Amino acid sequence: MTLSGILAIFLVVLALVACAWPLGGYIYRTFVGERVRPDAVMVPVERAIYRLIGVNPEVEMDWKAYLRAMMVSNLVMALFAYAVFRLQGVLPLNPAHIPAMPPYLAFNTAASFITNTNWQNYAGEQSLSYLSQMIGITFLQFTSAATGLAAAMAFLRGLSRQKTDALGNFWVDLVKAHTRLLLPIAAILAVLLLALGVPETLSGPAVVHTLAGSMQTIARGPVATLEAIKQLGTNGGGFFNANSAHPFENPNAWTCILEIMGMGLIPTALVFTAGHFLRSRRLAIVLCTLLGAILLAGAYIVYAYEAAGNPILAHALGIHGPNMEGKEVRFGLPLTSLFVAATTAYTTGAVNAMHDSLMPLSGMVPLLFMMFNLIFGGKGVGLLNILMFLIIAVFISGLMVGRTPEIFGKKIEAREMKLATAAMLVHPFVILVPTAIAMALPSARASMGNPGLHGFTEVLYAFTSAAANNGSAFAGLNGNTPFYNISIGLVMLFGRYVSIIAMLAIAGSLAGKARIPETSGTLKVDTFAFGYVFVAVFIIVGALTFFPYLALGPIGEQLQLG
């Protein structure tokens, strides 16, 4: 580790938070209907869209209607994408004549992108046509991000309103997420990436003569537009199999910094948006400070262990130096380490290095971040997970002092706790049970690229990534088999929608309650003292749940290294 590397990581995170602060206020004003500068341009466009789809923007929905609209729209979009993948061989914009995607793989891919996971059991440049990349992949990267954002807005309305069943209008939230946030920022990011060397073309693969005198086919396509929403929407699915390690997706250190800031911008801003909704900017500062500190700690741990290198090489061969296996030298260790931490903290899943090549305890950092699933988290759903653990922390704190738990003036009763507990427990359930099944099946074990503890970590990482809707992988695992295509697809769906359903039900319950006046005995949630309790709760829950599996994986592997 070097001082310049440590400082570089800190400055990138600081710049990210500085950009997220004003964006959080803008998101709040947009979704509560206050006047904002883009109104003059966007309001007529949005009205035209509402007329086209037959929606009255003035009519709000209760939590059941909101959820119904969300689930139906997501089902239709997933079926559309599945059809595109299955029919791409006969559809236009396929200059490489790529055949149709097999049914199991098409199911996995559709489930992956509708859930904002972007797990890829295929190589994008070899398995998808340009049309599939644009109207299948890129389309879902926008709509899945907008869906998560809409769910977060509905939950914040439930916390901030009283004596009502209205949580907003899903269609209005979905449209605004596109017109006011995702499309404008993605366009700016795409132009910046273009200027820095990321290609954007509908021309077919380029065939070139190499210096060695042979012919080489170089894949290309509409990369910049996909890359922008891939990061901004915390999607992570790459145009190329190498993802953001590919020079066409991430040519240099400047694009690497842009992509890190792109993936973290809106999730960080949503913490400040929550502060505006709940009239508690101090709470937003407390949460952002603590979660940011955990993000930095994770990045520094990765940096430290990768900089220390592999002790086996040092002891056996006398080779000292950092572990550069699976890394791009154009980024260096500091940006690589921050990317590893950020892509799992924000549940993006893009990679600029091969996580399978990380040192064991370095690889445990992204695993832990996905197991916690709330170090900022993904677009919208990450905020839901933060607020879910906030409710659980308030409940535990209330029990310790003998008071009825309440949060933001609303009593937390049995219904809310049952739903929050269900949302909390589904995450480890859909990680640990499929992992155990996979390790019990010889056909599933045959997909492991490595034996022993590292092979187990590959399987654990795959299901953790799917459950957290992250999408990154220990790429030594061959996931393109019927078992993994189906099981990982189902885990992604359960990991995404069960928690959303539970949290919207909580929002509907809290919205109907009257706000209780604050007294001297009211638990203050906007203090660092409570913030430490909040952090302790999710760390203890994570440690108790996942430690045995981590001991069989990265911890055991580190002990083997000596």
From Swiss-Prot:
The keyword Transport is annotated on this UniProt entry: yes
Compartment annotation: Cell membrane
Keyword Cell membrane tagged: yes
Assembly and oligomerization: The system is composed of three essential subunits: KdpA, KdpB and KdpC.
Protein name: Potassium-transporting ATPase potassium-binding subunit
Major subcellular site: membrane
InterPro entries xref list: KdpA
Membrane topology: Multi-pass membrane protein
Family according to the record: Belongs to the KdpA family.
One GO molecular-function entry: P-type potassium transmembrane transporter activity
Cellular component aspect of the GO annotation: plasma membrane
Residues annotated as transmembrane: 5-25, 65-85, 135-155, 181-201, 257-277, 283-303, 331-351, 358-378, 381-401, 422-442, 486-506, 528-548
